[in-house]
Structures are given as C-alpha cells and as structure tokens.
Amino acid sequence: MEFSKFIETAPEEIKDYLEKCRKTPQSPTWHPEGDVLKHTKIVFSRAAKTGDINYMFAAIFHDLGKTESTKLNKRGSWSSYGHEFISARLVIKHKDWISSQGADVDLVHDLVISHMKIKMMDEMRKPKQEEFKAKPNYEKIKEFSSFDNMKTLTPEELSL
C-alpha cells in the first residue's frame, strides 16, 4: 500500500497534521532523514510491508504530536517530549476512521502511546521492565519500534 493512497480517506484534520509534519524539524542525531513527514513515510513503508493495517495506522499517527511539542532544547537540538500522548489522543479522536478501515483502535492506540517507552527499557527498573514486557501487545510494540528506528535507514528509504 502506498502512503498517498492510504491517506486519501483520512479526515481533513489528519491531512492537515501530516502537512504540518513537513515543516516540523527533528534532531539529525536520531533522524538523519529530515522532517517528520519524511520520517512518517519511511515508517509507513516499513509497516506496509507486513500487510498489518494496525501497524500502518500506528505509523501514520505515532509522531503527529510532534507538530505541537517540538521545541529547541537547551543544547540547541530539536526535542518533542510527550508527543506520543498527543498522538495517542488523535487516535482516540479519529477512532471511527481507523475502525472503518478494519484496524483495531485499542491496538493502534497502544502502539502509538508505547512507541517511545520501549526505547527506554534499559533505563527502567527491573520491575517496570517486567511489567512492560507483560503487556499483551509487547511483541507488537517491539516490532513497531523496529520500523521507527532510523539507524537502519537505507538509501532507498531516503528517496521516499
């Protein structure tokens, strides 16, 4: 599935957020690909290869909150603290669109709200790690997180 085809049925608000993503910068340390829209297209492309509609929706929504939360930090780099919570609220707001396309809103919400937490596993205390690993969607969150990892960026993906 192509990104542009997938978002044809998206509510106008989501299309507006995606357009704002084009103008939302990211730290080149974590995102050598550039702006949030380019990143979203790469994550979507990786998710689409699985054929799992839930991953595709999570890819669309996971960083939309960066349009509202991105700021220069004290080190002069871009940070988007808490963007996953804004993004997760958008999933709930647009649950009718998500479910009308055959996706599981609860799973999409869990993938979106958890996509940053899984990256912090090593910093969690053991009991918190075990609690997170016990989540019913843990393996899916882990897989989705791999789509979001730009350390594995290919030249082909940069051209998306």
Predicted segments, located by residue:
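Acidic/His-rich, divalent-metal-binding segments that scaffold phosphate/diphosphate chemistry
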Residues: 1-79
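Divalent metal-dependent catalytic cores for phosphoryl transfer on phosphate-bearing substrates
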Residues: 46-157
